[in-house]
Amino acid sequence: MKVRAAVLRQIGLPAPYAQSRPLSIEEVDLADPGPGELRVKIRAAGLCHSDLSAINGDRPWPVPIVPGHEAAAEVVEVGSAVLDVKVGDHVVLVFRPSCGACPDCSVGRPALCGPGGESNAAGGLLGGYRRLSLVGGGTLHHHMGCAAFAEYATVSRRSVVPIDRDLPWTQAALFGCAVLTGAGAVFNTARIEAGAKTAVVGLGGVGFSSLMAAIAAGARDVIAIDVLPAKLERALQLGATQVFDARDPEVLAQVKAATGGGVDYAFEMAGAVPALELAYRITRRGGTTVSAGLPNPAAIWPLQAVSMIAEERTIKGSYIGSCVPSRDVPRFVAMFRAGRLPVDQLLSETIRLDEINPALDRLARGESVRQVIVMD
């Protein structure tokens, strides 16, 4: 079938993106789902920094490619061998498919699935298949097994989690990345305890999700750190106990003074080495630093090893919040419905697919938390 999609043909075009237009809205071919696959109608798709990283080259992908990895959709066709999802079901797309059989999947760590990572890196679906192509022929890649910046997508069954039908599309989409990654880092990777002192460095959709999760987990201090005053003000409105400007040369001393020597848990969500360095240095002796920000693959962090050893510090990476999506999406939705995780507050604005390039500029400037594309 023919579908409209945002296609990235060249990586690294300069900002402003409203002028360089790295994403072109094109008609592309979408093949029928194969065994173990679904065709879904994309209802809403979030614009995430990982999408920007694909466009500016921080996270290289094969091109041409249809970006988009955070979305909610309706199932419109079911391939053979899919027995537990039916036409009409509502689903959240998950950007790391899991095979269910590799060593990591076998021990309950699907975020580390080897075949899932390999298929993502190659721009295909789980198993190496591609269901997208350019009109007239030519390879077209799937971003993270989702390719959600399109009217429809063909995805692996293992790239979706069914959700309640009454959850609004614009809110449901956020659970696929911002919530899984941010809240998962708190509940799964760090497993913070009630009464802990916490800090979040970097207030995008993932960072705000971490902040909300820390509050929900019963953290005593929830400190927010960013470079934009508007985001710091928003953090206070959402329940942060204190906020600090990351550009202030005294920010390290300020946080340590405010917390009596540092926080128990610091979450780096900015995807930049200076943010990771700050997150590490504001933790106390015996503290834990969790990084989920995904900097450029060439970025190197020079760690003072003796401080990590002598002060018994812990550093943890967190990918997709160390989540088991089939468990954690329903879990976080239940917390949202109970008023403990106000995911709806992440939504900055809704846009149309053909407004995506100017939206990239707002994302790059840090002016939005989550812009969500609503498909016509």
Residue spans of the language-model regions?
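Cysteine-cluster motifs in flexible loop/terminal segments that predominantly coordinate metals
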Residues: 95-152, 156-158
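Glycine-rich beta-strand-centered segment in the early N-terminal region that forms part
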Residues: 31-45, 55-106, 111, 119, ...
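Mid-domain Rossmann-like dinucleotide-binding core that forms the NAD(H)/NADP(H) cofactor-binding site
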Residues: 151-152, 158-160, 164-249, 253
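Local beta-strand N-terminus motif with an aromatic residue
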Residues: 88, 150, 195, 240, ...
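Short Gly/Pro-enriched turn/cap motifs at secondary-structure boundaries
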Residues: 18, 29-30, 62-68, 140-145, ...
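Glycine-rich cofactor phosphate-binding loops and adjacent beta1-alpha1 units
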Residues: 190-196, 227, 233-314
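C-terminal hydrophobic helical "lid"/dimerization subdomain
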Residues: 1, 261, 277-281, 322, ...
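Short, well-ordered coil/turn residues at beta-beta hairpins
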Residues: 44, 94, 267-269, 375
